[in-house]
């Protein structure tokens, strides 16, 4: 084609606002895309397993683009394991990363290296805008904690005291920034609307055994017999729920987060009043899909994606659509 003819073709394409079909081009490309996911080590039926299942489902749906995801796990109570795993990821030079942040300074070391290496990354769980992720998927933690307090006090409005159950890594710090922000929202609501309600904090240490947890719970309720409503801002409400059922404390309930099966059983049996669902499966699915759209299809992605806050109770817990996309 002559230069003059080429210019005429370009002019016509511009006039028609033609854009190349990125989808068709990507399908024609046989290149493999390797994504890595760094998340906390978790047990079966835990919240993070839901996230992982969603990511695997997205890879299955997007298999025509030769997308593969490798999972790396770190221990919440061992920051050196976070560093060890992210160094392995950097060594692999992946096309994209999905990560659940650890402590800010360690997380920043990882994200700084990814920026240097031009590796786009998605954040789950905690939104840290200063680290400049490609996108974030998760709840608005402050709003979620505020909402949790509001729901709790609908049934505890006449109480003089409530219990806040926490799980710390070292006697001070909880497992994630997300939980910190939820507590800020929770306490903000309580201060504004129920300033006279006493909030007792009970720490069930992250590394302790169930036997120790039950001893701590027994000691708490012997000391505070007037506590009838409890809340936790993590996915371990069943630690208290199971204890309440075992000790036949039918006049006490706890509220918590995440539709994991252990929590759901406590809801069905009445020891957990409400659960707030975070839609982990959807977070996992959309996080991988965002990498596909940005890296392979060359599409813009929405940087901040807050998940809906869904409340579950005994009446609707069995209708929760865990894997709906």
What spans do the regions from the language model cover?
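Flexible loop/hinge segments that line or gate small-molecule binding clefts
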Residues: 105-143, 260-268, 272
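Amphipathic helical "hinge" segments at domain boundaries
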Residues: 20-80, 84
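Hinge/cleft segment of the Venus flytrap/periplasmic-binding protein
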Residues: 12, 16, 173-174, 190-193, ...
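Hinge/beta->alpha junction and helix N-cap segments in small-molecule ligand-binding domains
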Residues: 40-49, 70-80, 138-144, 166-188, ...
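N-terminal helix-turn-helix DNA-binding module of bacterial transcription factors
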Residues: 1-30
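Hydrophobic alpha-helical
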Residues: 89, 96-116, 198-263
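Hydrophobic alpha-helical segments within soluble ligand-binding/sensing domains
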Residues: 136-163, 213-214, 279-296
């Amino acid at each position: 084609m002559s230069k003059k003819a080429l210019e005429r073709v370009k002019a016509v394409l511009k006039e028609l606002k033609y854009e190349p079909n990125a989808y068709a081009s990507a399908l024609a490309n046989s290149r493999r895309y390797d994504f890595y996911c760094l998340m906390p080590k978790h047990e079966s039926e835990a919240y993070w397993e839901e996230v992982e299942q969603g990511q695997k489902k997205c890879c299955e749906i997007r298999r025509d683009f030769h997308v593969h995801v490798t999972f790396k796990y770190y221990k919440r109570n061992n920051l050196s394991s976070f560093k060890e795993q992210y160094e392995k990821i950097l060594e692999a030079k992946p096309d994209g990363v999905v990560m659940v942040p650890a402590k800010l300074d360690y997380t920043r070391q990882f994200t700084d290296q990814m920026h240097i290496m031009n590796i786009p990354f998605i954040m789950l769980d905690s939104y840290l805008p200063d680290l400049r992720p490609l996108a974030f998927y998760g709840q608005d933690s402050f709003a979620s904690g505020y909402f949790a307090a509001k729901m709790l006090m609908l049934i505890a409005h006449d109480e003089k005291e409530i219990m806040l159950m926490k799980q710390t890594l070292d006697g001070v710090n909880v497992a994630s920034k997300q939980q910190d922000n939820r507590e800020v929202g929770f306490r903000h609501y309580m201060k504004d609307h129920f300033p006279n309600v006493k909030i007792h904090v009970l720490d069930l240490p992250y590394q302790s055994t169930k036997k120790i947890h039950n001893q701590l719970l027994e000691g708490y309720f012997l000391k505070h017999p007037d506590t009838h409503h409890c809340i936790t801002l993590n996915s371990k409400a069943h630690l208290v729920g199971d204890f309440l059922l075992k000790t036949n404390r039918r006049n006490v309930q706890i509220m918590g987060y995440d539709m994991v099966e252990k929590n759901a059983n406590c809801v069905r049996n009445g020891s957990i009043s409400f659960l707030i669902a975070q839609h982990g499966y959807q977070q996992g699915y959309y996080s991988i899909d965002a990498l596909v759209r940005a890296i392979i299809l060359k599409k813009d992605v929405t940087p901040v994606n807050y998940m809906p806050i869904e409340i579950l109770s005994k009446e609707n817990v069995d209708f929760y659509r865990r894997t709906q996309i």
